[in-house]
UniProtKB/Swiss-Prot annotation:
GO molecular-function term, one example from the UniProt record: metal ion binding
Upper taxonomic lineage: Bacteria, Pseudomonadati, Spirochaetota, Spirochaetia, Leptospirales
Entry keywords, A to Z: Cell cycle, Cell division, GTP-binding, Magnesium, Metal-binding, Nucleotide-binding, Septation
SUPFAM superfamilies: P-loop containing nucleoside triphosphate hydrolases
Name this polypeptide is given: Probable GTP-binding protein EngB
Amino-acid positions noted as binding GTP in the UniProt annotation, renumbered to this chain: 40-47, 67-71, 85-88, 152-155, 184-186
Pfam families hit by this protein: MMR_HSR1
Gene: engB
Protein residues bound to Mg(2+): S47, T69
Length: 221
């Protein structure tokens, strides 16, 4: 799939800025501005994916230590929607207590974020999809949140592995027929146009918001 024509080196989303970080879901003000969140295990490549979609090298901080980020990070895109980089969960170096805390934060966010319209569930294509992530997909459907399963690092699979992955995806789609799945490689760019289209379609639906008529999300110290 080709993206709309654009000037060379000009990003698809021209107006992007970091807005705020939150340590608790109940600190996030409700503004009526739609949100797309990125969730997944700590080593799935969420922050790298967000940077790749927005074509900014270091907008979302990518830590060399998976599981280090424990905040909800908000990025304002084209003055219309927020992309939210959620803390990762499930990395083996984290304690069980840390894992539970991150899952609690994620569920609190899902329960309280009235403006959340879409969840990108980011999963390394080299790994199995854990049961709790399958349940997360079901939770999204129950709450009228569009889930998109994003299988990252697809360039690291050989043809045999890719065939096995497609079979597993078919089984998941039998469970959730309406689930959209996108195979992604940040290295080759595969799948990124599809994800940008999902973000852009929400922007088009919302329309550009006038800054003077919206409250800015303020950061916390």
């Amino acid at each position: 799939m080709n993206e709309d024509p654009q000037k060379k080196d000009e990003p698809f989303f021209k107006d992007v800025e970091f807005k705020a970080s939150y340590g608790e879901a109940n600190q996030i003000p409700s503004q009526g501005i739609p949100q797309i969140a990125f969730a997944g295990r700590s080593n799935a490549g969420k922050s790298s994916l967000l940077n790749a979609i927005l074509e900014r090298k270091s907008l979302a901080k990518v830590s060399s230590t998976p599981g280090k980020t424990k905040l909800l990070n908000f990025f304002f895109v084209n003055r219309s929607i927020y992309l939210v980089d959620l803390p990762g969960f499930g990395y083996s170096a984290n304690s069980h207590k840390d894992h539970e805390a991150m899952m609690d934060l994620l569920m609190d966010y899902l329960n309280l974020a009235k403006d959340l319209k879409c969840l990108f569930l980011v999963c390394d294509s080299q790994r199995e999809l854990p049961e709790e992530e399958l349940e997360l997909i079901g939770t999204c459907f129950e709450r009228n949140i569009k889930p998109v399963l994003v299988r990252t690092k697809i360039d690291k699979l050989n043809q045999s592995d890719l065939s096995k992955l497609r079979k597993k995806m078919k089984n998941i789609h039998e469970l959730y027929p309406m689930l959209e799945t996108v195979l992604v490689s940040n290295k080759s760019g595969k799948g990124l146009p599809e994800l940008r289209k999902i973000v852009d379609s929400l922007i088009t639906t919302v329309g550009t918001l006038v800054e003077g008529n919206t409250k800015k999300i303020e950061g916390i110290s």
